[in-house]
Amino acid sequence: MRQGKCHNFECSTAARGTVVDVPDGSEFRCPECGSDLRKVGAWHHLPAAFVVFLIVQAAFFGFSGWEWAFGAPRKTSSRTEGSVILRLAGSNTIGSGLGPALAEAFLKQQLQASDVRVQAGAVAEETNISGLLPGAHSRSVITIAAHGSATAFAGLAEGKCDIGAASRKVKPDEARTLSALGDMTAFASEHVLGLDGVAVIVNSTNPLTSLRVDQVAQIFSGAVTDWAQVGGKPGPITIYARDDKSGTYDTFKNLILGSNALVSTAHRYEDSNQLSDAVANDANGVGFIGLPYIHSAKAVAIATTGARPLLPNLLTVATEDYPLSRRLFLYTPENSPNRLVRPFVEFALSKAGQDIVANAGFVSQNIRLERAVAPADAPKAYRALTQAAQRLSLDFRFRTGKSDLDNKALVDLERMAAFFSDLRYRGEDVLLLGFADNTGVRAVNLQLSLDRARKVNEEFRRRGLKPSLVEGFGPDLPVASNDTDDGREKNRRVEVWLKGATTVAARE
């Protein structure tokens, strides 16, 4: 049996917020209006029914009630005594701060645990988050081992973790190794946790306003040592960088340095605020930093070959247009024996979970309306359409080599439906603007971009939303280089804009 809610605003089932039970094998549609249902995880009903049952189980039979629900617990071997109910492993970017914050909130808010503690594990880069579940006599522990993204997939393959955390996509060979657990690239197993972005900052007196990605790499690897070499005012470049254990450094290394080493003369900092202040006080300084720490320094716009420079901000990172942005992932078996896996992932992707993502210094996927100005080189029709409109903080993108929406887009569709549902708004003023890469003939790319926008329009209408305009702009306004597969994939997108935003804002 599956459960879902209707989000067709003209349907009384949706208006009442009724949860619809759908037998397995039946179409997942509203029985009243026929619209697709938005899936409701079973965990959403636990506090009202199932958790009460488990509390009674625990009260009479000890921990066995929880064991029945979540699988046999494992005793911890760390400094936190108790039984392990969930294991995460992988990325240090996720595991150092965000992972523990999500685990702590999950224990408190979803499992109603008391006396929740966050403690270092017995091994470096490991954390134990524990609490007392209702009716239980011993502590329940969520363990997080943050030893790098590769260990997420190794841990899943070896059965050493329940959820793999990664700051990159699963590689083809890793997916093949894990095929017994399901298709790791499929919707059931690949979950976008949040977005990460890094700003390149200079002194406010530095006249330089933009850099290409390759120039940033040359600067921080020491291949370029004077500002004049990148079009700036002559003067020696002073490098400031975060320490090796920083998630910000991990992101920068993956997106910029790659196999190149950071120049040995770089001044390293453990504190982002201190690094930002150092650049702000050095006329020749340059550094990289998380978005919240730009402060008195100046962020420069970043460009890839053939694409316009973009400044780092919440919108450009949320839409993934900014070159130094990346997705953070959770990977799970298609059918995990641990019944806490799905509830944890659902919580992490929920509005409450995404608020925690934002509080941890990353960019959440909660939808926002943002003021945006069309670039000067945009097509005249594009500028006219988006004038006085607001842009929604997401782009819809597609699976590599296919016309299907990717896994993030599928979740974003539900976020979009909820966003407009909360406003009691049917999307009459929504603009869907499609784009393509530049491979092949322009006329074909114009049609492809329109087809992508129509695909999103179809999904909107299945959810009771009625966009007023669907248009394609072909290869215009690339946000990434068309010389690479990743760049072309980024350029194949659909933007969402909203006319009459003042009317919507008034309803909030």
Residue ranges and their predicted role:
Residues 33-42:
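Short Cys/His-rich micro-motifs in 6-15 aa windows
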Residues 63-402, 407-411, 488-490, 503-508:
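Flexible loop/hinge segments at secondary-structure junctions
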Residues 6, 30-33:
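Short cysteine-rich clusters marking metal-coordination/redox-active sites
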Residues 18-29:
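Short linker/helix segments within small regulatory modules
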Residues 425, 435-508:
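Periplasmic OmpA-like peptidoglycan-binding domain that tethers envelope proteins to the cell wall
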Residues 1-6, 24-25:
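Flanking scaffold residues of small Cys/His-coordinated metal-binding clusters
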